[in-house]
Amino acid sequence: MQPTIKTTMGIKNLNRFLKENCTKKSIRKIQLNHLTNKTVVIDTSIYMYRYIAENALMENMYLLISLLLSNNIVPLFVFDGKPPIEKNELLKLRRLEKKRAEYKYNDMIAEYNIIDTSTLSADENHKMLQEMSSLKKQFVRVTENDIQQVKTLLNAYGVMYYDSIHEADDVCAYLVKSGKAWACISDDMDMFVYGCTRVLRNISLLHTSAILYDTPCILNELCMTERIFREIMVLSGTDYNIHCNTNLDMTIKWYTKYTARDVSLTNITFYEWLHRNSDYITTDIRELLDICDLFTTKHIQDKCLENIEIKLAPRNDSLIRELMTESGFVFT
């Protein structure tokens, strides 16, 4: 059987697994005013891609920043740097997928523009428009100009930002785990593999809410250590092992068998046990452990991060208004 090539962000089906196996003590909806006087870090690129896809980058970034500050939440926006070389193959595949989506979108647009839409049923027309919208989101690109616009807006608000050397997720996890921030706002499921203590997902600008994931509580309810959880997720397929022929459901089934093993084998690790008792692991154990190591924050040695104090600077309301007016935002 050919290995499945994984190109989606984060661990596939992890969110479903957590929701099915954890209680509201670990995963619950909260209003943002519950975070008053707390600091948060934001994995910025996720929201930039989303807001660009909605043709509302500056408007929604303005609303997000305003929402946090109006609830007395002190944010730090973390920007991605250069991806690690271990992701080169994945990034090539994603670029190809973007091109395919763009070609298909352009073909559909051309077809839609020449057909008589009155001959389509309401359902057919809706389905075609939905597919084009979905395709357009698949080839969204963030430009350097987009990044500079957002940074200028952050400066105008007096909000701090940090340029990561590599990707933002490990920096966000480090800042939360070290106690410099209370939680991370991100929809990337990799945050749990890093052991980020608290993650805020599905932030809603409309309902001023988010879903709070408490990682220590999650691990407690799953009866797993952070190390075991990370090993399970890495074996199930990450951005660093895209050719693996494994998945989360099967890995969990094998882990359940491992925990029910003969108690005389207490010193054997999960990977070692799998290697001896199955053909589920097809790669070298050392390679898997090296990937696990990539999902730790111990390699972060930036003195600026060690001494960082997340706080607000004075805001420039006239600059905020100028920037937003230039972006077409109408103040009421």
Residue ranges and their predicted role:
Residues 182-190, 206-209, 222-225:
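A polyampholytic, Gly/Pro-enriched intrinsically disordered region
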Residues 93-96, 180-182, 201-204:
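Short, hinge-like loop/turn segments at secondary-structure boundaries
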Residues 191-194, 198-199, 204-212, 216:
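Conserved NTP-donor binding/palm subdomain of two-metal-ion nucleotidyltransferases/polymerases, i.e.
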Residues 172-200:
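Acidic, metal-binding active-site segment of PIN/NYN-like and related structure-specific nucleases
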Residues 166-171:
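Short acidic loop-to-helix transition motifs that present clustered carboxylates
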Residues 3, 7, 12-17, 21, ...:
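Noncatalytic, basic helical substrate-engagement surface that gates or grips nucleic-acid strands
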Residues 2-6, 24-36, 71, 208-332:
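Non-catalytic nucleic-acid-binding/docking modules located in mid-to-C-terminal regions
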